[in-house]
Amino acid sequence: TSITIPDGVTNIGERAFYDCTGLTAVTIPDSVTSIGGYAFSGCAGLTSITIPCSVTSIGKQAFFGCTGLKDVYITDIGKWCGISFEDAFATPLQYAHKLHLNGDLVTNLVIPDSVTSIGGFAFWGCAGLTAVTIPDSVTSIGGSAFSGCKGLTSVTMGNGLTSISNYAFCDCTGLTTITIPD
């Protein structure tokens, strides 16, 4: 079953599609700014999802139990970095492991200069990442921002970084190179 949420909808409410195990695809319009807690929790049949750049917050465990997720599609890395993820299971990357930007699989993530902070849980579980480059414009990395990125081997940090929160790179078991400027 696939669902297209109509244009004009601004919020996907708490538990809106909770435990809809037969749900395989969801189209979310650009009008949506928030996804409520547990909104897609238990949707084990969901295989991919596109999160529009209009989304600014995703509630607690919104994607918990979405074990069939393979791919997450976005169009703006800067907007993704700014989403407020309430917990680790608010990000669909926890299960999907693969992030696509404008259709292309992201393995070497280059954060754009327009970004000043990377939010907590932003890339949690994105095992498809192998390298991350953080520009001078970024001053803070949120808690667990890159936790569980098991494929990540190198991180290059910019000069502007003043704060790296708890667990930012926790469980990045493949990480071998971290470049920090003087």
Q: For the regions a protein language model found, what residue spans apply to each?
A:
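Acidic, Ser/Thr-rich peripheral helices and adjacent loops at domain boundaries
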Residues: 86-98
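Structural signature of tandem-repeat unit edges
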Residues: 1-11, 21-34, 44-57, 66-83, ...
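Consensus positions within tandem repeat domains that build extended binding/scaffold surfaces
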Residues: 13-18, 36-41, 59-64, 87, ...
